[in-house]
């Protein structure tokens, strides 16, 4: 785990960057001609303390969107069959909905769909928030919610929601639920700008653009650097960061 990244000597003339990191209880340091910081934006100011104050402030702007992906294993999906549905949208409940997983198709592998008497996985999604607050404050409240919520609360809410949605189809949680897996993501997804809450910055002046500016032999790449929570954006930022170092032979 990297703990400190700094230029060896003055940033303007440094020929190397030193990275201090920990592994198995010991601390090590390694030097390189260029470094790409690909961690979360909000962690970078703590790791690279020499960054300009304005850049640190920009890196702290975004707040990760907390998420919960819950998977419920059912012994059968007779209740879905009887109701003639594959999922239920419920934006006012603890999870915003539930839906049966589609059979996987990976490479040459093709899962064989089972009948209503066969087991099935059901996916649920929750985005903890606090309505009425600005979006970043809602995300912070969501972080706290995920850190303090017990599994018992999740289980009771899930069982209740399944009964409300599938009870008319004969669903019985004590009989039909085989297992529950709750994947909590307090760190969640990269913050994306919203015109309801965020200013309309001129080109080049948004926090993600200021935050990802090259600093000597250090560049920055991650989905936060694009203010977009998608793999393609992270790849684009990685390409940019490497090119910034390669274009002037820094590496």
Task: Provide a role label for each language-model segment.
Residues 17-92:
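Glycine-rich loop(s) and the adjacent beta-strand/alpha-helix scaffold that form part
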Residues 22, 73, 79-251:
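Conserved flavin/dinucleotide-binding core of flavoenzymes
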Residues 12-13, 29-30, 63-65, 115-118, ...:
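Extracellular/periplasmic catalytic domains that process cell-envelope and extracellular macromolecules
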Residues 1, 8, 37-38, 221:
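Generic beta-strand/beta-sheet core signal
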Residues 11-12, 25-27, 54, 248-251:
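Secondary-structure transition/capping motifs at alpha-helix termini
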Residues 1-18:
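A conserved short coil-to-beta-strand element within the FAD-binding core of flavoproteins
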Residues 2-5, 32-33, 40, 120, ...:
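C-terminal substrate/ligand-recognition segments
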């Amino acid at each position: 785990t990297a703990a400190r990244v700094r230029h060896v000597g003055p940033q303007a003339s440094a020929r190397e960057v030193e990275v201090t990191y920990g592994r198995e209880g010991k601390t090590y340091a390694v030097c390189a001609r260029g470094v790409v910081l690909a961690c979360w934006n909000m962690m970078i100011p703590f790791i690279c303390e020499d960054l300009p104050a304005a850049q640190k402030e920009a890196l702290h702007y975004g707040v990760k969107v907390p998420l919960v992906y819950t998977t419920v294993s059912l012994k059968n999906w007779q209740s879905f069959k009887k109701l003639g549905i594959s999922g239920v949208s419920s934006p006012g409940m603890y999870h915003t909905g539930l839906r049966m997983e589609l059979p996987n198709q990976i490479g040459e592998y093709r899962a064989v769909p089972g009948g209503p008497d066969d087991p099935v996985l059901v996916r649920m999604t929750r985005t903890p928030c606090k309505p009425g607050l600005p979006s970043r404050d809602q995300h912070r409240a969501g972080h706290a919610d995920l850190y303090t919520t017990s599994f018992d609360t999740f289980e009771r809410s899930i069982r209740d929601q399944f009964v409300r949605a599938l009870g008319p189809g004969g669903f019985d949680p004590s009989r039909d639920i085989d297992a529950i897996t709750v994947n909590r993501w307090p760190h969640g997804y990269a913050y994306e700008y919203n015109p309801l809450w965020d200013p309309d910055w001129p080109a080049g002046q948004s926090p993600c653009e200021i935050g990802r500016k090259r600093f000597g032999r250090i560049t920055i790449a991650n989905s936060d650097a694009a203010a977009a929570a998608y793999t393609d954006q992270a790849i684009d930022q990685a390409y940019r960061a490497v090119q910034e170092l390669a274009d002037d032979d820094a590496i």
